[in-house]
A protein has these predicted regions:
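Bacterial N-terminal signal peptides that target proteins for export
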Residues: 1-9
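Catalytic nucleophile loop of clan PA
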Residues: 140-145, 299-325
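C-terminal motif of bacterial Sec signal peptides marking the signal peptidase cleavage site
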Residues: 16-19
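Short amphipathic alpha-helix segments
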Residues: 43-62
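Short glycine/threonine-rich beta-strand-turn micro-motifs
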Residues: 58-90, 94
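Serine endopeptidase catalytic core focused on the charge-relay Asp
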Residues: 123-287, 313-314
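Bacterial signal peptide processing site
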Residues: 21-23
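Post-signal peptide N-terminal segment of mature Sec-exported envelope proteins
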Residues: 28-45
Length: 355
């Protein structure tokens, strides 16, 4: 269920935590088409052979999997190389299993897929965090002087604006009840001056959490999925923050920016409006001088739970420049709003986010 805060067509996007379980998808290996032909034994005989052969075959270096193929009553073993094939066949012969009851195929290694929603130590930008009943995204790790911290949204605290010592968990308190960090800085929203009558304002939807001493973190690292706007949450590498934009508040129209968040993964779009004053729907909050991003192809760029995602520009390869923090968007997720990094520092103080 989404935590939805409506304001003038935009949404502040956190995610209500109801329950969590392991949602990993099974891995389907890609196999070479090398299959031996031979006699088929009875199902009962094949099952006895498989029970004996599986542990022996999987003990062979280079073995990938063991399977009893129900449609043929044959034993199938996946291996990485021909050397392993010979060893697997020898193991089967020692058990008295005829060669024509055994199939060996070349298989790719099967690896565990780590998701943005899994437990990560050291922590890094883009992964899931949990507080209270809600889920958000860890934006980026940063040092505030000697204080090792991470930055997320102000609305990803127990109360938006002001410090209530919100406790954070990763990925959730049910998976790991260790408090990884505690809210340390979240300026109150101001009234008057440039702030519209009857509303409360800030220039960034950002808060800082101070890490617990026992939690390891990687400054300057953002989790990277397989590609932009493809919906994948599986981490395939990382981006490195090599620079941070301490000066820009108004980004050029058409500037390409990216984010990584726990719900929609790595998304990319272009700045379509810059230094926009935005009313947060369903609240009295106005965020001043924000940037708006859309994907030219209409792709979804943000979803519930992506709140807190870092915003960055790719400079070369996997090296990136940190430019801000995402906090909201429209109901369809095709538009996101972010606070420039310069304004985050104006409100939270000097931060070092580079590796």
């Amino acid at each position: 269920m989404l935590q939805v805060r409506r304001w003038s067509g935009f949404l502040a996007l956190g995610l209500l935590l109801v329950s969590c379980r392991d949602g990993s998808d099974p891995v389907s290996p890609t196999l070479a088409a090398r299959v031996d032909q031979g006699a088929q034994g009875s199902r009962e005989q094949a099952a006895r052979w498989f029970e004996a052969a599986s542990p022996e075959a999987l003990a062979v270096p280079g073995a990938v999997y063991a399977d009893l193929r129900e449609e043929s009553n044959r034993l199938e073993f996946g291996v990485l190389h021909l050397g392993a094939e010979a060893a697997v066949r020898a193991a089967a012969r020692r058990l008295g299993i005829p060669d024509d009851a055994v199939t060996v195929v070349l298989a790719e290694p099967i690896v565990q897929m780590a998701s943005l929603r899994d437990k990560w130590r050291p922590t890094q930008g883009g992964i899931q965090i949990h507080f209270g009943l809600y889920l958000c995204t860890m934006g980026f790790n940063a040092d505030d002087g000697t204080q090792r911290s991470f930055i997320t949204n102000s609305h990803c605290t127990n109360k938006q604006g002001g410090v209530e010592s919100t406790k954070y968990y990763q990925p959730t308190s049910t998976v790991d009840p260790t408090v990884i960090a505690t809210e340390a800085e979240d300026p109150t929203y101001f009234k008057g001056g440039v702030c519209p009558r009857g509303r409360r304002c800030r220039y960034s939807d950002a808060a800082r959490a101070l890490y617990s001493s026992g939690t390891s973190s990687s400054r300057g690292i953002i989790a990277k999925t397989s590609g932009p706007n493809n919906g994948s949450l599986n981490v395939t590498g990382n981006f490195t923050i090599t620079s941070q934009d301490n000066t820009t508040t108004s980004f050029g129209i058409g500037t390409t920016v990216n984010k990584v968040g726990r719900t929609t993964g790595w998304t990319q779009g272009n700045v379509t409006q810059t230094c926009v004053n935005v009313n947060v729907s369903g609240s009295t909050i106005t965020q001043l001088c924000q940037s708006i991003v859309q994907n030219p192809g209409g792709a979804v760029v943000i979803g519930g739970g992506d709140s807190g995602s870092q915003m960055f520009q790719i400079t070369s390869g996997d090296n990136v420049t940190l430019v801000g923090i995402a906090w909201g968007g429209n109901s369809s997720g095709t538009m996101l709003v972010f606070s420039p990094f310069k304004q985050i520092q104006q409100e939270l103080g000097s931060l070092v986010a580079t590796q």
